[in-house]
Amino acid sequence: MTKTVRSETDTFGPIDVPAAALWGAQTQRSLAHFRISSEKMPPELILALARVKRACAEANRGLGKLDDAKAAAIAGAADEVLAGRHDGEFPLSVWQTGSGTQSNMNMNEVLANRASELLGGRRGPGRLVHPNDDVNLGQSSNDIFPTAMHVAAATQVKERLLPSLDLLRHALESKAEAFADVVKIGRTHLQDATPLTLGQEISGWAAQLALSEQAVRAALPMLCQLAVGGTAVGTGLNTDPSFGAAVAARLAEQSGLPFESAGNKFAALAGHEPLVFAHGALKTLAAALMKIANDIRWLASGPRSGLGELSLPENEPGSSIMPGKVNPTQCEAMTMLCCQVLGNDAALAIGAASGNFELNVFKPLIAHNFLQSARLLADGMDSLREHCVDGMEANRARIAELMARSLMLVTALNPHIGYDKAAAIAKHAHRHGTTLREAALALGHLSAEQFDAWVRPEDMV
């Protein structure tokens, strides 16, 4: 009869583990003790941990600390994790020890058991590779987990967030160019203002994204400073003095990111300023995206009783009771996820500010929030671009209608008749329901020819 469990042992003694699982005793204890909510350790962080463990094995081999066979087996097991072959082996909750120790040990146990099998051994008692002595050699959760946090964050920013941001910015720049000839009324304080082109308005959105991109890129160098080599409290106890630099060099070579060993390991363990700063850049991007999405849905409001200056793609029915209704759903999704990012920033900052002495113990929260924000923003920008911006069109007739009705075109008269007379024309037109031209002639402040020559919206942009 096939056994469904096997016995694994740690310093607390034996514990039953599912026979098919690659994890060991400490992972099993964490599963038992932290049955909290449904948030699991982010997959991006798991992959980063695997990359870090592979680099550590290679560095230890290079330093003569780990024999070739074990190092190759650990690296091979890590490669399997990176290939997605063991996704189910990392079941731990985000809400665990604040150092991430249990997830570090989860990775150590999985790699040790799988490396043992790759060497022809078994998993569990009698394994050929030890999770602490071999996989975790020269390391502590206190330096390895924050190292993985930085690797995951920098990787997601480079590979997911920035490409999505770039594509959305280019899509908006394309629309700005396409609508460069569409003169429309501007709005400030939600009231009519002087004209601009729709292209100019959209160019502002694109420029907001460009500024946000600058902020995100400025944060990358700090994320590339790694804690590895600091071990328990930053002194580097029980590791080779060159270990941190060796690991960082391997990670840099494999990723194309300029990873390097942090100059001060005490700060790297006890504080998380790089992630606070980087998430601040994500918050900046979220603020810009929320403004852009709100502008788009307001300009598309209607279709008959709103502004109606933009037409958006009709992707799905909008109401379960009102037939034919179509809503700006992509904008709504974007604004919701931006709210989540702003909330993530507050929680992340509180966590980063709450370290004590030589260690911050809010690391899983910080990692979870950062990676969720990066994921939300990247996916949200892709969705907004594909299902909204690319198909967005200008309602030229409606724009012209609203332009003709606006009282703020009177601003063009200021240099010719002065502010007070121009204001009197606007108030007269509003009070009597007439056009500006009719009001100007009624008050006798200028001739019809002068009005037609001076009030030209296309000359006001």
UniProtKB/Swiss-Prot annotation:
Signal peptide: none annotated. It comes from Chromobacterium violaceum (strain ATCC 12472 / DSM 30191 / JCM 1249 / CCUG 213 / NBRC 12614 / NCIMB 9131 / NCTC 9757 / MK). This is Fumarate hydratase class II. The gene is fumC. SUPFAM superfamilies: L-aspartase-like. Keywords: Cytoplasm, Lyase, Tricarboxylic acid cycle. Substrate binds at residues 99-101, 127, 130-133, 140-142, 188, 320, 325-327. The keyword Chloroplast does not apply. PROSITE patterns: FUMARATE_LYASES (PS00163). The lineage of its organism: Bacteria, Pseudomonadati, Pseudomonadota, Betaproteobacteria, Neisseriales.
